[in-house]
């Protein structure tokens, strides 16, 4: 029963922290005019979202970090998961800050984000001491050598940006992360990695608490502060459970959901080339 008790406690605590923080944070973000910027070239149906508070990821990520540190001892794997998540949190926060405070709609340049993610990947590779083999279904373990580190960067960049692209549509990013985190929680329990299972459960709880305020009509968006960090956290779990091969499939399915949602909310659009954030 212990294997389910701690994850359940993490879901409840993280959801409670976000639910308690949201009624206080949303008015503050309104007061500071930290509103969502909608690109003029984007779908006209999304213009009504302009001004909706963003940077809600602050309460999501802090709730996850507090929850796992309260419930679990800080192991190397848990520390690495937190490092990757908080590194992407810092990147996302800076990106949102430039958008909403400096009023520059594009935020950080793509190459600046990539540089930040390369640094995070290098730190992960240095501290983790991960084996360089990749498990492939029906083929077993394949040693990639130094190619593994290129794969690690691809997983971090691809997964974090896949979540990032789903933000800005009511409930889509948080709902997507809940589904992926639940799946990874079960994988972690199956592998006997209880601390990582608690980490995934905290992600589920925090996103459930956030979904109450992000469901249509959204009162707040997580912004890059939350979406990049949650994507980075999922990538971290994939790397630490050595299931990196699953991440591209998850990223592709996330983008397909975003495409479908964009078409449903903007039927005249041929392609969701623009995110609303």
How does the language model describe each region?
Residues 30-35, 47:
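A cross-family signal for N-terminal binding/gating loops and helix N-caps
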Residues 74-109, 113-114:
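Hydrophobic alpha-helical hairpins/lids featuring a short glycine-rich hinge
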Residues 66-73, 93-101, 124-137:
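Transmembrane alpha-helix boundary signature
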Residues 38-52, 103-116:
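Juxtamembrane helix-capping/reentrant segments at transmembrane boundaries
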Residues 50-51, 138-147:
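Short aromatic-rich membrane-water interface segments that cap or initiate transmembrane helices
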Residues 104-141, 179:
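Glycine/proline-rich, flexible active-site/cofactor-binding loop segments
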Residues 1-30, 60-90, 124, 145-277:
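Alpha-helical transmembrane segments
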């Amino acid at each position: 029963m212990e294997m389910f008790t701690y994850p359940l406690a993490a879901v409840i605590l993280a959801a409670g922290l976000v639910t308690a923080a949201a009624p206080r944070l949303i008015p503050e973000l309104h007061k500071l005019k930290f509103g969502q910027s909608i690109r003029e070239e984007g779908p006209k149906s999304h213009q009504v979202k302009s001004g909706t508070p963003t940077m809600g990821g602050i309460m999501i990520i802090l709730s996850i970090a507090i929850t796992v540190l309260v419930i679990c001892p800080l192991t190397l794997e848990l520390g690495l998961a937190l490092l990757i998540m908080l590194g992407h949190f810092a990147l996302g926060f800076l990106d949102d800050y430039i958008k909403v405070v400096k009023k520059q709609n594009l935020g950080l340049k793509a190459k600046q984000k990539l540089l930040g993610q390369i640094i995070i990947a290098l730190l992960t590779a240095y501290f983790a001491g991960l084996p360089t083999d990749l498990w492939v279904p029906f083929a077993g373990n394949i040693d990639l050598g130094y190619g593994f580190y290129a794969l690690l960067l691809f997983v971090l960049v691809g997964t974090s940006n896949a979540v990032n692209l789903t933000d800005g549509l009511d409930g889509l990013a948080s709902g997507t992360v809940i589904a992926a985190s639940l799946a990874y929680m079960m994988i972690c329990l199956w592998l006997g990695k209880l601390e990582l299972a608690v980490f995934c459960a905290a992600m589920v709880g925090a996103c459930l608490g956030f979904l109450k305020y992000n469901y249509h009509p959204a009162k707040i968006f997580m912004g890059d502060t939350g979406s990049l960090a949650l994507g980075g956290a999922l990538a971290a779990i994939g790397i630490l459970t050595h299931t990196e091969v699953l991440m591209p499939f998850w990223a592709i399915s996330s983008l397909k959901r975003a495409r479908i949602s964009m078409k449903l909310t903007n039927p005249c659009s041929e392609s969701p080339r623009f995110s609303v954030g």
